[in-house]
Amino acid sequence: DWIQQFEQEGIKNTLILQKEIENLKRDVRGITSLFKLSKKITRSEFKTYAASLLDKNHFIRSFQWIPRIKQSERSALESQAQKEGLVNFHFTILSEESTFITAPNKREYFPIQYIEPFFGNDSLLGFDISSQPTLLNLVNRARDSGKIVAANTKDLFNQDPNRMLTLFFSPLYKGGETPKTTEARKRLFMGVAVGTYQLNDMIRQVIEPYLIPGIFL
């Protein structure tokens, strides 16, 4: 029966899922490598590279580049984005009513500078993810470890509050290489590439071939 068949395929399914997760980590690491190769990646270059990854799987929600920005650098980055045609670009946070409001001044920010797909996600540009404790914790874990970190979270922007998202954070450091000490990693940290995925869709893609008609996940 289908249960026995599914049990027999359990190890195979696990290996497939592990391989897919490694592919996701490789993709977000590739975004980081893009910024290693050049000190300045344009919005168009980011779009072209991300598009090649987005075409591969429907469960990829988005790719983002999120730089570490000091207070003294805020105005320049906002002006740069506005000159690129994003006339309403400015650093934002979520209000208690879950609407975007201007981010207050502080020592440093982690704004979403680039995001693909652009359409449908453009309202997230400029959002300071460090204003959300869960996301700031992921940034700090990636920064301090020098490795990709991942976590499941609800959609913070109410696009689909019932769907869990999986976020992969890949850190980037000045000089391109990962510093050997935590202190150096904190000092040379430049930002993170982020991949947002719907892993439940990926799991469904693996499991559905073994379900008999009328059985739904």
Give short role names for the model-derived ranges:
Residues 7-8, 36-217:
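Intrinsically disordered, low-complexity polar/acidic regions
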Residues 27-30, 118-119:
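Short acidic (Asp/Glu) and glycine-rich catalytic loops that position anionic groups and cofactors
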Residues 2-28, 35-43:
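Membrane-proximal amphipathic alpha-helices
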